[in-house]
């Protein structure tokens, strides 16, 4: 199938920190979701493009084929906005942005998707809002992945800790669920459908 006329390329940005030492940490669950989505799209390779690792793909949907970019900023979490701004300004055409990030306000395994709003204490998302807002009045839809309450552990330490072994099955399940919802959204292009799917109660709960 060919890309339908007028279709906007999707830009899905997963947030995390580069480097093996951060690969399994809670803050990097956004990277995990993008890796899972890339596998669903046919093991698309991530190649360095400016300040991000980017994979290209195309998804078939009811209206035809839609191009998509999957991006993992390599600027470290707190400077994610710089990488995203580069991708938006260097694009040959309009991009529909959606950000995937961790959220310690949500229970482990929960998803929440919104069209817009505040950063909610997520520094990578805050950086994106800061840098993208200067481009236009663009909304920044975001899919938050719950990583659990830090309790008495300072949040800045908690997010850089790896998931516990007992938590891993729940993490793998929510990562796969998020990737599935994103795959569906890429095909249909319906953000309301994505929001409804992500905000529905977990059928396994």
Per-range role (PLM):
Residues 145:
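Extracellular serine-dependent O-acyl
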Residues 165-166:
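A hydrophobic, small-residue-rich beta->alpha segment in the mid-to-C-terminal subdomain
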């Amino acid at each position: 199938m060919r890309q339908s006329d007028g279709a906007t390329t999707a830009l899905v940005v997963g947030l995390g920190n580069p480097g093996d030492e951060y690969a399994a940490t809670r803050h990097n669950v956004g990277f995990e979701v993008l890796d899972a989505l890339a596998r669903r799209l046919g093991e698309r390779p991530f190649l360095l493009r400016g300040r991000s690792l980017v994979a290209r793909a195309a998804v078939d949907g009811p209206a035809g084929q839609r191009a998509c970019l999957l991006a993992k900023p390599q600027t470290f979490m707190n400077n994610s906005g710089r990488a995203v701004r580069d991708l938006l300004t260097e694009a040959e055409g309009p991009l529909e942005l959606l950000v995937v990030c961790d959220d310690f306000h949500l229970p482990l395994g929960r998803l929440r998707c919104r069209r817009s709003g505040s950063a909610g204490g997520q520094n990578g998302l805050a950086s994106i809002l800061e840098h993208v807002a200067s481009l236009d009045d663009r909304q920044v839809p975001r899919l938050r992945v719950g990583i659990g309450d830090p309790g008495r552990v300072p949040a800045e330490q908690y997010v850089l800790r790896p998931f516990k072994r007992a938590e891993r099955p729940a993490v793998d399940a929510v990562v796969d669920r998020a990737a599935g919802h994103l795959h569906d959204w890429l095909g249909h292009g319906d953000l309301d459908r994505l929001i409804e799917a992500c905000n529905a109660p977990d059928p396994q709960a």
